[in-house]
Amino acid sequence: LKPVSAEDGSRLWLRQSTDAHAQITAPRQSPTLNIAVNELKQAWKGLPVTLVLKKDKQLSSEGFRIRQVNEKLTVTSPTETGLLYAAYHLIRLQEMRNFGKPSETDLEITENPAYDLRILNHWDNLDRSIERGYAGKSLWNWEELPGTLSDRYEAYARANASIGINATVLNNVNASSKILSAEYLEKVKALADVFRPYGIKVYLSINFASPMQLGGLSTADPLDKDVIAWWKQKVKEIYRTIPDFGGFLVKANSEGQPGPCDFNRTHAEGANMLADALKPYKGIVMWRAFVYSPTDADRAKQAYLEFQPLDGQFRDNVIVQIKNGPVDFQPREPYSPLFGAMPRTPQMVEFQITQEYLGFSNHLAYLAPMWEEFFDFVKPSSLKAIAGVANIGTDTNWCGHPFAQANWYAFGRMAWNPSLTSETIAEEWLKQTFFDASNPKHAPIAYEIHNMMMESREAVVDYMMPLGLHHLFAWGHHY
């Protein structure tokens, strides 16, 4: 009898065998390099691999070059994180049956990420509920942190590193000021320590009224000297606890959240105050452009009317984070008119990986075609960074629907390289997750499922947005 066990999806797309015993050489030992070496030793079945730390004018800090000469592979990057990304890329190519065997000709692959910042936004609350989450509770067990570290924290970091995601915002944009308390900063530090070897920086969503709610001040006016001093001291405290902290994500004057407009100040004045506090530590502010403008009832125009006149007024370490469409993550929207309308202001796109308007975790909706459609109109090079609202929770398979994992995977791959096609990404995910690329019996099934994935988003558009009408769902929960 042959033992049979069910596949629970917990290994995501990282289902390769772990008994390869590959020959790997590294320049030194470190937490990050040790991970890269161990991943390759366990999974790589190809030629001997030498990892080399070396500056290269053609490589960005996280870029890498894989070169095959005769029967040896050399992997080069300026940084340890770049070598880790290269290790995962080698394993991906192996699973796709594309690389790593002896060849009569020399081969070379060069990869540079399109964006320095490739970040997940978790809309996770401190009570472990998730706004627009459909895969269980929040991964972050705040009550047990910092003393108890779940194995899933490292598994989460590993999954993100394998697809090139290098940053995470841990908490909801509708933020509790409690996240900035000394008690919670120690909890955040514990997570940052787990993520760091995988090249992942931690960021926090903040409540703009934190000086009042947490600091006992009478105002949160960004031009008030006591408010400025409070934020500078708080930022100093954060970096003393987490030296490589990334910065803040801010939802201000939107859906009831406090912001600078409450004090007759502009979004730029609010963002710049925070940016000035973060700048000595090389931190950044991601300031969301999702606002309900008081000056015009047409929602599709509101972000444009509010932000376009502020072009050129933001500090250089502020990035305006704009939803891909002008309304709110609908199954199909035109791109936001803010893209390209603020040439003197760094911008980043916010995609929604979680399926708030596309059937929760009940529906198969492969979202890479939607994001590919966006990049057909908005030049990737016009953006400074890319964010995705996460679809991850405590469900055994991480994302609820078995195919929702593909959207997490696709976001990471497209954040690294926006020129990848949704077809290619779907094929990668399927071969790593469900099918053995070397087994010809799998090919017909894989072909049919690939087609199903590629047609799924358009099907959602057809039955959720007939005649181009949007917001057709029940009140509140958006289903």
Which positions does each model-derived feature cover?
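Acidic, contiguous N-terminal accessory segments
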Residues: L1-N70, P78-T81, T105
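Second-shell loop/turn segments in exported
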Residues: Q23-T32, T74-S77, W142-P146, P260-F263, ...
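Structural motif
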Residues: T25-S30, L53-K57, T76-P78, D124, ...
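Feature activates predominantly on carbohydrate-active enzymes
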Residues: A36-E39, S60-G63, Q68-K236, R240-L249, ...
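Active-site beta-loop-alpha junctions enriched in small/polar residues
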Residues: L120, N125-D127, V173-A175, N207-P211, ...
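Active-site-proximal beta-alpha loop/turn segments in soluble metabolic enzymes
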Residues: S176-S177, M212-P222, K251-D262, F290, ...
